[in-house]
Every structure is written in C-alpha cells, then in structure tokens.
Amino acid sequence: MIDEALFDAEEKMEKAVSVAREDMATIRTGRANPGMFSRIVIDYYGTHTPITQLASINVPEARMVVIKPYEANQLHAIETAIRNSDLGVNPTNDGTIIRVAVPQLTEERRRDLVKQAKHKGEEARVSVRNIRRKAMEELHRIRKDGEAGEDEVARAEKDLDKSTHQYVAQIDELVKHKEGDLLEV
C-alpha cells in the first residue's frame, strides 16, 4: 500500500512538471521556437486539432518560423489561427507556406512574460504540494488502519518529502531558465 501511494504521488508530480515544461514552452521568448505554436488549434473537419499535427514547423533563422501545412486547403485556417492567437506575431502567407517573423520583445513585454512564467511555475509548485498533501493523507490513513507500522510510514513520508523537493527544484530550474531566456537581449 505504501509503495502504491508513493508511486502514484511520484507519477502525478512528474506529470505536473511535464505540464509546467509545456507551459514554459508556450511562453514566447525573443527567438523563434516551434513550441510556441503547440497550443494553437484550428477546426479541422469538425475537430479542434493543434497546428503541430496539421503542418511541419521549422525554424530556418533565429527570428523566423516556416509552417508548411500537410494539406494546402488548411493554409488560410492556420494563418488566421496564428493571427488571432495571443502570440503577438503576424504571419504571412505566400500560397504554399506561412512565414512568421518573431519580433524583438520590448522590455515591458519581457517583464510581463517573466511574471507569466513565474505565475505558471507557482501553479506547478502548488500542484506538486497538493499531490504531496494527498499522498500524506493516504499514508496517515494506512497507518491509522494498521496496514503499515509507524516506522514504515515515517520512512515513506521522508521519501515523499524528498521527491517533493526534487520536483519543486525541477520547476524552479524551469522558471529560472525561462527567465534567463526572456531577459537575454
């Protein structure tokens, strides 16, 4: 029972870090990055589908993204979705591909994006701590029900705390790295 509770908590914490990593990838830095388009979806034959599944996305230059749809008839829909997104970029359509020039970020915009990154990092930390709290409740229930001894539960709690600190440190590192990317001119 203890091993199950720890494994379940660790799996959920890993997922929280993975979500934080995806969130950080969607925050635009001054450089072109295919990940910035991962959350943009279009209506593809009645289904909301991410652009990343409908087109190849390449970065030929530091500030240029080239998007080549697998189906030419999706070109306009992809262009419109990018234009309507919150990325602050203006795509140009040449009939076969979409070019997206990534503009230089202003100092004010950089600060806003750093705040956004810190906020997403804090959400991920809270998520990890909530997972820890639920796992601790499960461990206390196991001890109360007599399914495991005091020493086993105490050891499991230490392991859980160690895992929690490890995952929080990973999230902190993601935020720090993103902050460095954003403030780099």
Curated annotation (Swiss-Prot):
Transmembrane segments: none annotated. It is found in: Cytoplasm. It comes from the Bacteria. One of its GO terms (biological process) is translational termination. It holds the Pfam family RRF. Its main location: cytoplasm. GO terms for molecular function: ribosomal large subunit binding. InterPro entries: Ribosome_recyc_fac, Ribosome_recyc_fac_dom, RRF_sf. One of its GO terms (cellular component) is cytoplasm. Keywords: Cytoplasm, Protein biosynthesis. Residues 143-163 are annotated as: Disordered. Responsible for the release of ribosomes from messenger RNA at the termination of protein biosynthesis. May increase the efficiency of translation by recycling ribosomes from one round of translation to another. Belongs to the RRF family. This is Ribosome-recycling factor. It comes from Mycobacterium ulcerans (strain Agy99). The lineage of its organism: Bacteria, Bacillati, Actinomycetota, Actinomycetes, Mycobacteriales.
